[in-house]
A protein has these predicted regions:
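Secretory targeting and sorting signals
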Residues: 1-25
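Beta-strand-enriched cores of mature, soluble protein domains
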Residues: 26-183
Length: 183
């Protein structure tokens, strides 16, 4: 499962709508703050993913719960802005998220152990260069993928607008619709 390619990942939290904190738990529910605190800058720091919940109709037609069952993601801060907020971060490490349909109990263990280089912009937008599987949540009308939860795998870039719009651009890869898997 370990990938050591491009630049690394802790992606699930950010892709589901959260911006991770460096050297501190990503206060992880979707929609939490967008400020990233800089860590020591002397190596790789843990970047844990928190559980998440989406009501029916927000990602899938049914309510969904996600929880890490394997989380060995680390991050390395490359650059900070003059105010100390993080500008560019590498993420990598093993991450498996159990995604559960809370109406039926059906679940799927999604491998999100990809790697990424993420640039956080001052307007709240982000730019991703990624390799390997990452869990991506898309709201209605908020991306170039339909509303849903996906494992995006391969080589790709992703832009996340300040408004949360996610544009996934596959160079080579696949998308796996998790709502269909557990629906």
């Amino acid at each position: 499962m370990r990938r050591t390619v491009l630049a690394p990942l802790a992606l699930a939290a950010v892709l589901l709508g959260v911006r991770p904190a460096v050297a501190a738990p990503a206060s992880a529910g979707p929609g939490n703050g967008t400020h990233v605190e800089a860590g020591t800058g002397t190596g790789w720091d843990p970047a844990p993913s928190a559980p998440f919940d989406f009501g029916a109709g927000l990602r899938c037609d049914f309510p969904v719960h996600g929880e890490p069952v394997v989380d060995r993601v680390v991050q390395h801060v490359l650059d900070t802005d003059p105010d100390g907020s993080v500008k560019r971060v590498l993420y990598k490490g093993d991450l498996v998220i159990r995604v559960t349909n809370t109406e039926t109990g059906a679940f799927y263990d999604a491998d999100a152990s990809g790697s990424a280089l993420v640039e956080y912009r001052t307007d709240g937008s982000q730019s991703w260069a990624a390799h390997g599987p990452v869990l991506v949540g898309v709201g209605e009308g908020k991306g170039n993928l339909p509303r849903g939860l996906y494992v995006v795998d391969g080589v790709y870039t992703m832009s996340i607008g300040a408004d949360g719009y996610k544009a996934v651009n596959l160079v080579r890869g696949t998308t796996d619709d998790l709502c269909a898997r557990i629906g």
